[in-house]
Structures are given as C-alpha cells and as structure tokens.
A protein has these predicted regions:
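Short, surface-exposed loop or secondary-structure junction motifs
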Residues: 35-36, 144-384
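Short active-site loop at a secondary-structure junction
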Residues: 61-74, 93-162, 218-230, 302-305
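Bacterial N-terminal signal peptides that target proteins for export
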Residues: 2-15
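Short, conserved catalytic-motif segment at the N-terminal edge
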Residues: 38-106, 126, 141-148, 290-292, ...
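Boundary at the C-terminal end of the N-terminal hydrophobic targeting segment
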Residues: 28-30
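Short, well-ordered beta-strand elements
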Residues: 399-401, 407-416
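Bacterial N-terminal signal peptides
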Residues: 12-24
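Hydrophobic (often cysteine-bearing) scaffold residues that line and stabilize catalytic clefts
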Residues: 51-55, 106-110, 114, 160, ...
Length: 438
C-alpha cells in the first residue's frame, strides 16, 4: 500500500507538470475546476507562478511521506484563479488519483455557510441580531446558567448575535472542561466521552434543540467566547424563520445562485466515487481516525458540522465574500452586511474561555465576528496575513481564508483529522503568501 501511494503521488506530480506544460506555468499546476473562477496568469495579479509551484513540491513531499493521503488546493487573487492542484490519492484504500472535483467533509466550515444563511434572513427583514433565540425556539425560554453553587437564572436573554459569535454558553462536550456540563451533554446524547468526532445527525434538529435547551448554559449569555454548538442552534433558527429545512433554504438562496453544485449535507449514490477519505490512523500518533458517514441523508442538516462540498464550490463561496457579497452578478449579501460579519464582535468586554474550546480561537490570536475568525492586526498572529482577514476550518483539516486587503482567497481541502492539521493549514497559508510579488 505504501509503495502504491508513493507511486500515486509521484504520478500526480508528473501530471501536474504535464498540465503546466500544456496550459502554461501560471495556470496553476492542475486542471481548472469546472465551477471555479476564471483562471489567469499568476503574474497578471501580482503573484509568482514559480513560487506558487512550491505548494505542489512541498505538499507532494508531505503526501509521499504519508503525512497526508491527498489534497486539493485553490488560490485566487483579484478574483482570478491562479493556482489549482489535486495531489496524492482520493482514498488511501483505493488509491486512484485525487481529483479537483473530490467531495470533502467540511465539518465546521459549514458554520460560515449557515451564518450567511442567517444574515440573508436579516437582510430580508425576517430576523434581527437582537432577537431572543427563544422567540424562534421557545425551548430556550427561561434557561439557567451553571455556577459553582448550582444553577442560576440567566441575566439576559440569549440572542441571535450570541449564536453567531459563540457567546451563547452552549459548549461542545469534548472541548469544555466543566465536568457537570460534560455529564449533562452525555446524558442528553449530545456528547460521547473520548469521541471527538461524535455524530449527532441521527436525531432531528428539533430533538437536538430540545435536549440542549434543558441543559443549563456554561456561561452567562454574551460574557464569554467558547467554541460551541451555537451554530447548530442557529441552523434551527434559520429553519424556524424560513419555514424550510436548512439544506433547502441554502440551496435556494446560496448554493444555486452561486453554482455550488456539490455542496450539501450528504452525498447521493451517483457522487460517492468522488468522496475523499482519510487514513485509518493518524500518521503522527497512531490514533484511529473516524469520519462521519455522508452516504445517507441525515435526520438533521447540521449547521455546525454536517456539510460536504468541493474546493471549487467553497472557493466560489469565499470569493463572494471577498467581493462584498456578490459573484458573477448574483448578489447574496450587501457589502455592508459582509463588513459587519467580518468585524470584531468580541471587543474587550467578552472573555476568551481558558479551555480547549476557547483555545480554538485564543491560541491563534484572532478575534471573532459573525461566523468567522477575524484578524485584528497585521502582527502577533504566527501566520502571514493582514488586519481584517477572516477564516475558518473543519475537523478533518480543511481551511479557507479571505484577505480583503491583499484581495487573496485560499481554500485547502484534505481529510486529515489528526495532529498535523494545524501544521498543514499554516504551511499552506505561508506558501501562498510568499508567492505575492507585487
């Protein structure tokens, strides 16, 4: 198997070089994804094709060393696709070459998509950031809050803004350190100790919300940032306001207008041969890797972690945001709404929880907006970027970012849920930024 994987990665690198020769070095080292952006020479938008080629070489070596099974990487600048590669294999158990239209489990990269859905309804005048969550989901009326001395009443209502910025006090069981909350989430079937990839899509969205609403909040609403189940609740709000299942609403208002043809909450039989898979075990730790089954329609469209899609679909979504809410003449959001979403919504008054759930944000020296991590300054963060850039990632290693000042968009798609996730995400970003030459 190892030798076949290495042969596959070498052949993929060779194919990349052949395509470069056919289409020119600045067309990105792989075939242009069918639904991605218009391609352009890297030099025409202030980037170096030779420097972008380092992505192919470096990640090709990572794949050859079995640190990744495969990857799809897309880079756009000034609205033009300047790099696209599909390296390694799609499935380690069946090592056919990775393809640019491979379908990935995007996990928490579903959150920005669901956040956009909520903002669409706000622009429609049907929802407000200040709306109490209980206005749309009555189960959250009169919620309690955990304290060392027991349960107390919430000092204010949980709002839609709290859901969007993860200040609602609805932590993930696997990321919080509060044992009482962990136990309550486990008893409610919303967390399984020792299983970070626990899948709750077998219950309906209504069941999930009813169970979650019975558990006291970890923090007073609006006081503390901790990565959370809030976006799953936000998805239920979108369903309550729109009267439609989340996937249907997104298809009508986002996926179809933007031609995101492969983004959904499960993969139908005709597309299963395109699904990317992970190694059975983490190559660094040997820990077993288990990803969600996307071959059957789930009981709920998990706004927090249930999405699947291609790199080109997510590039179109990201470019829409980079353009201020519009792509190819299809306006999804106002420019002012995108600016609101990608501004700092934590400020100095909201604490970052000293837990693994808080560290998801705090360790990266970013703040948080309405659905995205937002960079507050050019410096401090250990990755290149500029103030105002925004991003998010997914459990299986995926990551995207938009840098408005540099007019730069990056999409990194892998299925590598292990200890090397952060390293590969940062490596991708570093290699993209070093290719800027204007």
């Amino acid at each position: 198997m190892i030798s076949s994987l290495r042969r596959g990665s070498r052949s993929r690198l060779l194919l990349a070089l052949v395509l470069t020769a056919l289409f020119g070095p600045s067309t990105a080292h792989a075939q242009r994804p069918a639904s991605a952006l218009v391609a352009a020479p890297a030099e025409s938008v202030g980037m170096s094709a030779a420097r972008l080629a380092r992505l192919t070489a470096v990640f090709g070596k990572e794949i050859e060393d079995r640190k990744l099974p495969g990857s799809v990487m897309l880079v756009a600048r000034k609205g033009k696709l300047v790099y696209a590669s599909a390296l390694g294999v799609r499935d380690p158990k069946n090592p056919d070459p990775m393809r640019t239209d491979a379908i990935f489990r995007i996990y928490s990269m579903t959150k920005p998509i669901a956040s956009v859905a909520a903002m669409i309804l706000i622009e429609d005048g049907k929802l407000q950031l200040t709306d109490p969550v209980s206005k749309w989901l009555p189960a959250f009326k009169d919620v309690k809050v955990w304290t060392d001395g027991g349960e107390v009443a919430a000092q204010r209502v949980m709002t839609v803004q709290d859901l969007l910025r993860h200040t609602a006090g609805l932590p993930y069981g696997e990321l919080t350190q509060n044992t009482a909350v962990k136990d309550a989430l486990a008893k409610a079937g919303l967390f399984k100790p020792g299983v970070i990839e626990f899948d709750v899509r077998d219950m309906t969205g209504a069941e999930q919300v009813e169970r979650l609403a019975r558990i006291p909040l970890l923090y007073q609403p609006g006081t503390t940032w901790e990565y959370s189940l809030a976006t799953d609740v936000l998805g239920r709000v979108v369903e309550a306001v729109s009267g439609k299942r989340l996937g249907v609403f997104l298809s009508e208002r986002l996926f179809t207008p933007l031609r995101m043809t492969d983004t959904a909450f499960w993969v139908p039989p005709a597309k299963l041969a395109r699904v990317a898979e992970a190694f059975d075990k983490d190559p660094l730790t040997g820990t077993a890797i288990r990803l969600i089954d996307v071959s059957k329609e789930p009981a709920n469209d998990s706004a927090g972690a249930g999405g699947v899609g291609t790199a080109s679909d997510y590039l179109r979504f990201s470019q829409m945001l980079a353009n201020g809410g519009v792509l190819d003449g299809q306006r999804v959001l106002s420019r002012t709404t995108v600016r609101l979403m990608t501004s700092d919504h934590l400020g100095s008054r909201i604490a970052i929880a000293p837990t693994p759930g808080g560290g998801v944000l705090g360790a990266s020296t970013y703040t948080f907006g309405l659905g995205f991590a937002v960079r507050p300054s050019d410096g401090i963060a250990p990755v290149p970027g500029t103030a105002g850039d925004f991003n998010w990632g997914g459990y299986a290693g995926t990551r995207f970012w938009v840098d408005p000042k540099e007019q730069l968009v990056g999409v990194f798609m892998v299925q590598s849920a292990g200890a090397l996730r952060a390293y590969h995400r940062e490596l991708f970003r570093q290699l993209v930024y070093q290719a800027i030459v204007d």
